[in-house]
Swiss-Prot record:
GN (gene name): atpH
NCBIfam families, per database record: ATP_synt_delta
Protein name: ATP synthase subunit delta
Membrane topology label: Peripheral membrane protein
Organism: Roseiflexus castenholzii (strain DSM 13941 / HLO8)
Role according to the record: F(1)F(0) ATP synthase produces ATP from ADP in the presence of a proton or sodium gradient. F-type ATPases consist of two structural domains, F(1) containing the extramembraneous catalytic core and F(0) containing the membrane proton channel, linked together by a central stalk and a peripheral stalk. During catalysis, ATP synthesis in the catalytic domain of F(1) is coupled via a rotary mechanism of the central stalk subunits to proton translocation.
Example of a GO MF term: proton-transporting ATP synthase activity, rotational mechanism
Subunit and interaction comment: F-type ATPases have 2 components, F(1) - the catalytic core - and F(0) - the membrane proton channel. F(1) has five subunits: alpha(3), beta(3), gamma(1), delta(1), epsilon(1). F(0) has three main subunits: a(1), b(2) and c(10-14). The alpha and beta chains form an alternating ring which encloses part of the gamma chain. F(1) is attached to F(0) by a central stalk formed by the gamma and epsilon chains, while a peripheral stalk is formed by the delta and b chains.
Length: 158
């Protein structure tokens, strides 16, 4: 399966799950009169996602049911954007990369992480050579500075 096919399937799943959650949340926030955890839960459709029920229970337990409409509005805004935040990659090199190098790196990263990946490039001469690529919480460090530091540690320890 290609990355683009996986993206299409993931988008369909995302739309389905968020659509059901939004519909259930809108139903819950449309009740009139006193807002209680019990009334909100009773207003939900039987097939409402478990996460929606858990959200209402958590807000009720903390006395924050009045904040549910704001949470729904924020969630709706996120789903319109297609998720929480687009994934961003930061590529740091020891020297300025050519447009062709940037394009090749961007293509390779998008093939692995999806077409919506935003890639930024920066220069840090202290790397001496190589690259450091950060995407989300993942870091790939092929810099000469890191390799030399590892050699130095190995020499010091034995």
């Amino acid at each position: 399966m290609s990355a683009s096919e996986a993206q299409v399937i993931a988008r369909a799943l995302f739309d389905s799950l968020t659509g059901a959650a939004l519909q259930a949340l809108h139903t819950a926030t449309s009740i009139n009169g006193e807002v209680t955890t019990e009334r909100l839960l009773a207003a939900l459709p039987a097939d409402a996602p478990r996460e929606v029920r858990n959200l209402i229970l958590a807000l009720g337990k903390e006395g924050n049911l009045d904040r549910l409409p704001a949470v729904v509005a924020a969630f709706e805004q996120m789903t319109r954007r297609g998720g929480a935040r687009p994934l961003t990659g930061e590529v740091t090199s020891a020297v300025e990369l050519s447009p062709q190098q940037r394009e090749r790196i961007t293509e390779q990263l998008k093939a692995r992480y999806g077409p919506d990946l935003e890639v930024r490039f920066s220069v840090d001469e202290s790397l001496i050579g190589g690259l450091i690529i950060r995407i989300g919480d993942q870091v790939l460090d092929t810099s000469l500075r890191t390799r030399m530091a590892a050699i130095q540690r190995n020499m010091m320890t034995g």
